[in-house]
Amino acid sequence: MGVLGGPSPRLRLYVYDFKEPGGEAERRKLRELLESHGAFRLQYSTYALLAEPEVHARVLRRVVARVDFEEGDSLIVVPMCRRCLRVARWVDAEGVRGLRF
C-alpha cells in the first residue's frame, strides 16, 4: 500500500484560527507543537503533517493539553486521502497546479 493509502490517511491538514487581538501566545504554542512533529506551513494558519496515525493522535492530545482555546478559537484537522490529493489544487501567481507531498 502506498504512503497515503489505507483507512487511516497519513497526511492531515491542521487549520487553526485564533481571535484577534490576543491569541498570539496560543498561536505560537500551536505552531511550535506542529513544527516539532515535522509539520510544514502551507499558509499562515494551515500546516500539513505526513505521519503515522499514532503521531497524529499524540499531536492532538498535546494540543488539547497545552493550547488554551477560548471562545472563537478553533483547530480543524482534515485527513487527506489519495483521491483528495489527486483532485486538490494550489492556486497562486504561477497558476493552478496539483499538490505534491
Curated annotation (Swiss-Prot):
<protein>
    <recommendedName>
        <fullName>CRISPR-associated endoribonuclease Cas2</fullName>
        <ecNumber>3.1.-.-</ecNumber>
    </recommendedName>
</protein>
<keyword id="KW-0378">Hydrolase</keyword>
<comment type="similarity">
    <text>Belongs to the CRISPR-associated endoribonuclease Cas2 protein family.</text>
</comment>
<dbReference type="InterPro" id="IPR019199">
    <property type="entry name" value="Virulence_VapD/CRISPR_Cas2"/>
</dbReference>
<keyword id="KW-0540">Nuclease</keyword>
<dbReference type="GO" id="GO:0004521">
    <property type="term" value="F:RNA endonuclease activity"/>
</dbReference>
<comment type="subunit">
    <text>Homodimer, forms a heterotetramer with a Cas1 homodimer.</text>
</comment>
<dbReference type="GO" id="GO:0043571">
    <property type="term" value="P:maintenance of CRISPR repeat elements"/>
</dbReference>
<keyword id="KW-0460">Magnesium</keyword>
<keyword id="KW-0051">Antiviral defense</keyword>
<comment type="function">
    <text>CRISPR (clustered regularly interspaced short palindromic repeat), is an adaptive immune system that provides protection against mobile genetic elements (viruses, transposable elements and conjugative plasmids). CRISPR clusters contain sequences complementary to antecedent mobile elements and target invading nucleic acids. CRISPR clusters are transcribed and processed into CRISPR RNA (crRNA). Functions as a ssRNA-specific endoribonuclease. Involved in the integration of spacer DNA into the CRISPR cassette.</text>
</comment>
<feature type="binding site">
    <location>
        <position position="17"/>
    </location>
    <ligand>
        <name>Mg(2+)</name>
    </ligand>
</feature>
<dbReference type="InterPro" id="IPR021127">
    <property type="entry name" value="CRISPR_associated_Cas2"/>
</dbReference>
<dbReference type="GO" id="GO:0051607">
    <property type="term" value="P:defense response to virus"/>
</dbReference>
<dbReference type="GO" id="GO:0046872">
    <property type="term" value="F:metal ion binding"/>
</dbReference>
<keyword id="KW-0479">Metal-binding</keyword>
<keyword id="KW-0255">Endonuclease</keyword>
<dbReference type="Pfam" id="PF09827">
    <property type="entry name" value="CRISPR_Cas2"/>
</dbReference>
